[in-house]
């Protein structure tokens, strides 16, 4: 009998950084939902400690996770909001007839597939007739509009992307009713209702519960207006990242530019103690919803036959690396290193977890493997109504999770790419004041590779990260590419760029990692079969 699957996602939750204090670590251990995910209960649980987003920010990351491919293939490379509306010509959403989603793959194998919560892969909102105004289901106070909810249920807006049951609108933007504070408890309630309905389901099922927080960090300066000040005793003091004091003048130039333009795009948000404590309090808010979801899963009798997967779409800089915020224009661990836990029947207990680098593009092939779904056979089915069905570029880690193979047998380089230029669009004006601002210039595209190479004592393997900043041919300006190279084993905070030492010979690992990047890019950065002809 095939297992059920529950995918729980948060938004903007980073993996704990190496400089986290014991007080903050102790606070995180009080988050009951997160602890239950890692514990596994009556079954095994595995935490993959070096898991990375495949892209940033929200739209490209989520689309990569749910398709198993990179933006170079699925095309959803830009995040709407701020400079871009959903209809901006620079924004390309996932077309439902091109690259199939996780829902499509599992439906092809006979699964029932459901989605609740933040989607942000296509613009799936219902609209008031004759307007561009999305149909809201919740007001600022959290009061639910039952008629609007019914409209979303009847129209099942995610059916073309392989999922049923989604209730909009998308929780995205600076409206209080779209914050995690308001929406996450409602998404947890929707999960409870879904699990009750699934008790009579004869088919195996895959359900996604996608939460908003800690994404509300984007509105930290508005927290009093929105009604969620941090309780005095809820979160300990959170120290600044050591790299917050670093200068940006020797970093890739796009970082200094984004550091300067971000306050002009939304609202100045000082990277102070209040800001940092607010971010961790948002973890606690998300954890309440996770706890409700897990309680409901058990209460409705699904706990023993459901594999639970937990991750986040991307992380948050929180002032690290010279005061950077959010997740754009770089590939530092604060931004792309995220939690990833798998627990449930058939998962071998691994109290110490797994330390090889893994990626969001590994998730889909791994879940197919855990379900016993043959990718080749399923590809034939999804290929009947999708024109861009390609072999999945990620690894199937199911044998590792079942304890049937070793980490060395599945270790491989991890690729990351980001073309998301959040500062550029048709409405380059401050979201609150309307004041115009200039978009960042220079090499704003980013690609990165993580790989273990034999650089340690006695040839021991060490994890390295190489990041390239570049522009594409035909883009504005003639900008030279820029590089960052970090030995994560010896420099886990990424403060010493081994690729930038003018006047001296480059370290030998630079050329090694550049070769790894070229090879990994060729294997994983696929492009569509169907492209415009000149």
Q: Which stretches of residues belong to each language-model region?
A:
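Active-site-proximal N-terminal segment of extracellular/periplasmic enzymes that hydrolyze or transfer
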Residues: 1-46, 493-504
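Active-site-proximal cap/lid insertion segments
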Residues: 12-27, 198-203, 211-305, 309-358, ...
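Polar, surface-exposed loop/tail segments
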Residues: 31-32, 58, 65, 118, ...
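Catalytic-site neighborhoods of secreted/periplasmic enzymes
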Residues: 43, 67-185, 197, 219-222
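Catalytic-adjacent loop/helix segments of enzymes that bind and process anionic phosphate/sulfate esters
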Residues: 155-214, 270-271, 275-281, 285
């Amino acid at each position: 009998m095939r297992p059920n699957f529950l995918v729980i996602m948060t938004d903007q939750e980073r993996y704990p950084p190496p400089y986290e204090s014991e007080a903050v670590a102790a606070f995180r251990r009080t988050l009951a939902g997160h602890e239950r995910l890692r514990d596994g209960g009556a079954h095994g649980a595995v935490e993959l400690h070096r898991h990375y987003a495949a892209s940033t920010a929200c739209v490209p990351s989520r689309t990569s996770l749910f398709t198993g491919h990179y933006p170079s293939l699925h095309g959803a490379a830009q995040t709407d909001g701020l400079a871009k509306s959903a209809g901006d010509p620079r924004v390309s959403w996932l077309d439902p007839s091109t690259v199939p989603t996780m829902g499509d793959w599992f439906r092809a194998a006979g699964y029932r597939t459901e989605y609740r919560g933040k989607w942000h892969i296509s613009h799936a909102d219902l609209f008031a007739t004759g307007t561009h105004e999305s149909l809201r289901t919740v007001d600022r106070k959290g009061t639910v509009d039952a008629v609007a909810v019914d409209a979303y249920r009847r129209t099942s807006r995610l059916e073309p992307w392989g999922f049923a049951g989604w209730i909009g609108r998308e929780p995205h933007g600076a409206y209080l009713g779209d914050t995690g504070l308001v929406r996450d408890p409602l998404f947890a309630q929707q999960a409870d209702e879904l699990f009750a309905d699934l008790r009579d389901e004869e088919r195996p099922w895959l359900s996604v519960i996608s939460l908003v927080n800690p994404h509300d960090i984007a509105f930290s300066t508005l927290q009093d207006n929105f009604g969620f000040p941090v309780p005095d005793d809820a979160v300990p003091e959170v120290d600044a990242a050591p790299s917050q004091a670093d200068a940006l003048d020797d970093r890739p130039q796009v970082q200094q530019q984004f550091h300067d333009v971000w306050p002009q795009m939304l609202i100045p948000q000082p990277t102070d103690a209040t800001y940092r404590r607010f971010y961790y309090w948002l973890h606690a808010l998300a954890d309440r919803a996770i706890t409700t979801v897990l309680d409901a899963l058990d209460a409705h009798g699904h706990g023993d036959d459901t594999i639970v997967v937990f991750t986040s779409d991307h992380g948050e800089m929180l002032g690290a690396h010279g005061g950077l915020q959010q997740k754009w224009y770089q590939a530092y661990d604060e931004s792309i290193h995220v939690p990833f836990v798998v627990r449930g029947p058939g998962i071998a207990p691994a109290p110490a977890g797994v330390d090889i680098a893994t990626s969001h593009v590994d998730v889909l092939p791994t879940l197919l493997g855990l379900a016993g779904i043959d990718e080749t056979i399923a590809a034939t089915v999804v290929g009947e109504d999708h024109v861009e069905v390609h072999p999945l570029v990620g690894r199937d880690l199911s044998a590792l999770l079942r304890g049937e193979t070793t980490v060395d047998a599945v270790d491989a380089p991890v690729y990351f790419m980001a073309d998301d230029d959040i500062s550029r669009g048709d409405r380059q004006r401050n979201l609150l004041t309307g004041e115009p601002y200039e978009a960042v210039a220079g090499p704003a595209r980013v690609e990165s590779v993580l790989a273990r190479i034999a650089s340690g004592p006695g040839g021991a393997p060490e994890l390295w990260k190489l990041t390239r900043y570049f522009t594409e041919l035909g883009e504005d300006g003639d900008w030279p590419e820029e590089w960052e190279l970090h030995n994560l084993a010896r420099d886990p905070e990424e403060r010493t760029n081994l690729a930038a030492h003018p006047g001296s010979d480059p370290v030998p690992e630079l050329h090694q990692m550049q070769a790894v990047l070229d090879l990994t890019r060729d294997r994983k950065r696929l492009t569509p079969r169907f492209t415009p002809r000149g």
